[in-house]
Design a protein with these regions (language model features):
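Accessory nucleic acid-recognition modules appended to NTPase machines
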Residues: 159-304
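Conserved catalytic segments around the Walker B and adjacent sensor/switch elements
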Residues: 2-15
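Conserved P-loop NTPase "ATPase switch" module shared by AAA+ and STAND
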Residues: 41-55
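Interdomain motor-coupling "hinge/lid" segment immediately C-terminal to the ATP-binding subdomain
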Residues: 86-202
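Structural recognition of the conserved hydrophobic beta-strand(s) that form the central parallel beta-sheet
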Residues: 73-79
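Short glycine-rich substrate-engagement loop in P-loop NTPases that contacts/grips substrate
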Residues: 13-39
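Signature of the SF2 helicase/ATPase Hel1-core->accessory helical subdomain module
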Residues: 67, 79-91
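Positively charged, low-complexity/disordered segments
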Residues: 305-306, 310-311
C-alpha cells in the first residue's frame, strides 16, 4: 500500500512535458515532481505519469527509474501507447511490466451497474437458471450494446441513466480519436486512416464475408491501406479478425490471412458511429440483427456436428 501519490498529466502540464529533455537524472526529475505537485516523493509514494506519450523521451525515462532508483514505484499510463512505442523514443525493453486496459466486458458491465448476481450466474454457466431469466438478461445485454464499456460512459450511465448523455460522451470520445489521427499519425496516412475508420460500420452492415477495400474507396487496393489499418490496430482502436479455414486447434494454424473483418474496440462507440438511436432498445431484437452480428456474440457449427460453439 502507498501512503500518497504524485500525479502528473503530461497532456496539460507544459512544465513537466519537457522535464526529460535535458537528461534522465532521477533526483532532478523527483525535485521537479515535488515542485509541481507539492508532494515530497519517498518510497511510500506512487508516482503516476499520465498521457506519458505526450512527454518527449518519457518512455525512455522509465528505464532510468528502474535502473537507478528502483525504490520508487512508477505507473505510466497513456492512450495510443502502441503508437508511441513505434516512435523515435527508445523503449525500455525488459524494464517495465505491461497491463492492457480494455472497455468493460458484459460481465464487468453487470457488476458495475449493480447486477453482480447475474454476472455470477453467467460465470457458473447454469443454463437452466439462465433460461429462466432470459428476458432480464436480454434487456441488460441491450443496455450493454448501447452504452458499451468505456469507463467514463459507463460511470455516467450509472449516475444518471441518461441515454442522450451516453451518446454525447461517446461522440466526444470519437471526436478525440479523430483529432488524434492528425496529431499522432504520419501526415501522409491521415486521410487513409480516416477512411478506414469511418468505413467500419458500413462494412459490418453489409453481407460481405470479408473486408472490402472497394467500400472504403472505389478502386482501392490492399497495399493502399495496409499502413492505415496497422496504425489503427497499434492504436488499439480496431481489431482485425481473420477468417479460419476450419475450426481446428490451434485456431491460428488455420488462419486465412487473405480474408478478414475489422471491428471497433467498443460496442457503444460502434452504435454511436452508426447513429443507432435509443429507440433501438425498445424495438425487439434490432440490436442483435443489425450489423450482421457485429455487436453481438457469434456461434459456429460444423457440418459434421450438432454442437454450437461461441466465437
Amino acid at each position: 500500500a502507498y501512503r500518497q501519490f504524485a500525479y502528473i498529466n503530461f497532456e496539460d502540464n507544459e512544465v513537466m512535458k519537457d522535464v526529460f529533455q535535458k537528461d534522465f537524472d532521477v533526483e532532478r526529475i523527483l525535485m521537479a515532481i515535488q515542485l509541481v505537485t507539492g508532494i515530497v516523493v519517498d518510497t511510500e509514494t506512487l508516482i503516476i505519469f499520465d498521457e506519458i506519450q505526450e512527454a518527449p523521451r518519457g518512455l525512455t525515462a522509465l528505464k532510468y527509474f528502474q535502473e537507478k532508483a528502483p525504490q520508487y514505484h512508477v505507473v505510466a499510463a497513456g492512450s495510443l501507447l502502441g503508437i508511441a512505442m513505434h516512435s523515435n523514443d527508445s523503449f525500455p525493453v525488459g524494464k517495465v511490466d505491461f497491463m492492457d486496459l480494455y472497455p468493460l466486458s458484459f460481465s464487468e458491465f453487470l457488476e458495475a451497474v449493480g447486477q453482480e448476481a447475474f454476472a455470477r450466474l453467467l460465470a457458473k454457466k447454469d443454463w437452466g437458471l439462465i433460461a429462466a431469466f432470459r428476458s432480464k438478461l436480454i434487456d441488460l445485454l441491450k443496455q450493454y450494446y448501447y452504452v458499451g464499456g468505456m469507463p467514463e460512459v459507463v460511470n455516467a450511465f450509472i449516475n444518471h441513466k441518461d441515454y442522450a448523455e451516453v451518446r454525447q460522451l461517446q461522440q466526444t470520445i470519437l471526436d478525440s480519436y479523430d483529432r488524434d489521427f492528425s496529431k499522432h499519425a504520419p501526415i501522409a496516412e491521415v486521410p487513409r486512416i480516416r477512411m478506414i475508420w469511418r468505413s467500419v460500420p458500413a462494412q459490418l452492415a453489409k453481407e460481405n464475408k470479408k473486408f472490402i477495400y472497394g467500400v472504403v474507396k472505389e478502386g482501392a487496393r490492399a497495399k493502399d491501406f495496409e499502413l492505415a489499418i496497422e496504425w489503427l490496430i497499434d492504436a488499439g482502436l480496431i481489431y482485425k479478425v481473420s477468417r479460419v479455414k476450419k475450426a481446428g486447434i490451434p485456431l491460428s494454424a488455420y488462419e486465412d490471412f487473405s480474408a478478414f473483418k475489422l471491428f471497433l474496440l467498443d460496442t457503444g462507440l460502434m452504435g454511436a458511429m452508426s447513429g443507432l438511436p435509443p429507440q433501438a432498445l425498445l424495438e425487439g431484437n434490432v440490436l442483435f440483427s443489425d450489423y450482421k452480428g457485429a455487436i453481438t456474440c457469434l456461434l459456429y457449427t460444423s457440418d459434421a456436428a450438432d454442437e454450437l460453439d461461441g466465437v
